[in-house]
Structures are given as structure tokens and as C-alpha cells.
């Protein structure tokens, strides 16, 4: 079970999204000062901000767990237009590692390096594929699968503090660039 961010809910269960823009070169420079990838560095920034806003009585009781979608096209060739990704979790335990930012970056970078290897990702893909191609899951009616998927989704939500996604470099066809201000 992961630490949960608490606070007031918005009316009608609406989400509040904060968008920001930064010069990626400057952020990359900063991440390289820590010998970290951009994703590891920004994940550590997210974790640090969660810790900074965390009530004192909650610090160290539960780990902070970040869910990160991984673009599998970076690891395996694919011509599919469909989503080709899997999910990985990184975890930071304040009790074990403390609140030093440099330590956070190092711990997160180490976890990502070990989890983002083709062999490990293949294991995850195999697990997903085995469930999808299982005879029992194919014959169970959709309404029953939906029921159990909702339960699984709620249970997995307990294991996550936040989600962070770095979609990476997006290249569009040259003729489209004049219509795009930013991503």
C-alpha cells in the first residue's frame, strides 16, 4: 500500500490539471548533473514535491509509489498503430532513504535502470499476454470480466501515489509543423 495524497475534492469530482512549460535543454542539463535520465530526475522532483507537502505525521509510514508508462517501441520494433506500452512502478521509502534530493534521484535512477531492460520488459509482456490469451478469460462474459477488472483497478490504485509520464521526443511530419505550437 502506497502513500495517498490527501486534500479537498473539487466539485463534481472534477480533476485539476496544471500544465507548465520549461526549456527541456535546461532540465536535461540539471538531470545530467545528477547523472540521471530525464524521467528519473523529474520523477524525483515529483517525489520531493509530494514529500514537501506531506503532513509530518504521514512521513515514512508508507512508501511513495510512482506509476510510469513505458513506451515499448523504444525497446522492441513495432509498426503497430496501437498503443504499445507497459507499466512500471518506482518506489521511494522515506524511512529507508531519507529526504535528501540527490539520494532520491540516485534511488529512482537505479530502479529505472534495472526495470527498463528488454529482458525484464519481455517478462511483463509475457504476463499480460498469458492473461489475455488464457482460455478461461476468453470464454468469461464481458460483464463478468468488467466486474473483476473494476475490483482489480481499485486494488491497484491503493498501490500508487501518483502517475508520471514522459512521452519523450515527438516527431511530426514536416508539413504538419506549421500547425503545431507545442505539445
Label every PLM stretch briefly.
Residues 1-36:
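Flexible, P/S/T/G-rich "lid" or insertion loops adjacent to the active sites of thioester-utilizing
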Residues 4, 38-46, 59-65:
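Short, structured secondary-structure boundary patches
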Residues 36-37, 99:
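A generic structural signal for alpha-helix starts
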Residues 19-22, 28, 51-183:
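Acyl-thioester-dependent acyl-group transfer interface
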Residues 27, 38-50, 108:
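Structural preference for long, well-ordered alpha-helical segments in enzyme cores
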Amino acid at each position: 500500500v502506497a502513500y495517498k495524497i490527501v486534500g479537498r475534492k473539487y466539485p463534481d469530482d472534477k480533476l485539476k490539471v496544471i500544465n507548465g512549460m520549461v526549456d527541456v535543454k535546461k532540465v536535461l542539463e540539471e538531470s545530467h548533473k545528477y547523472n540521471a535520465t530525464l524521467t528519473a530526475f523529474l520523477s524525483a522532483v515529483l517525489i520531493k514535491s509530494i514529500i514537501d507537502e506531506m503532513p509530518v505525521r504521514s512521513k515514512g509510514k508508507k512508501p511513495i509509489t510512482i506509476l510510469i508508462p513505458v513506451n515499448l517501441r523504444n525497446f522492441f520494433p513495432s509498426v503497430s498503430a496501437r498503443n504499445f506500452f507497459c507499466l512500471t512502478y518506482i518506489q521511494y521509502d522515506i524511512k529507508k532513504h531519507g529526504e535528501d534530493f540527490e539520494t532520491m534521484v540516485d534511488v529512482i535512477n537505479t530502479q529505472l535502470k534495472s526495470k527498463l531492460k528488454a529482458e525484464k520488459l519481455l517478462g511483463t509482456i509475457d504476463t499480460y499476454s498469458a492473461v489475455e490469451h488464457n482460455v478461461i478469460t476468453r470464454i468469461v462474459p464481458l460483464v463478468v470480466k468488467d466486474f473483476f477488472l473494476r475490483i482489480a483497478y481499485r486494488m491497484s490504485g491503493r498501490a500508487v501515489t501518483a502517475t508520471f509520464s514522459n512521452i519523450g521526443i515527438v516527431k511530426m511530419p514536416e508539413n504538419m509543423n506549421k500547425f503545431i505550437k507545442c505539445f
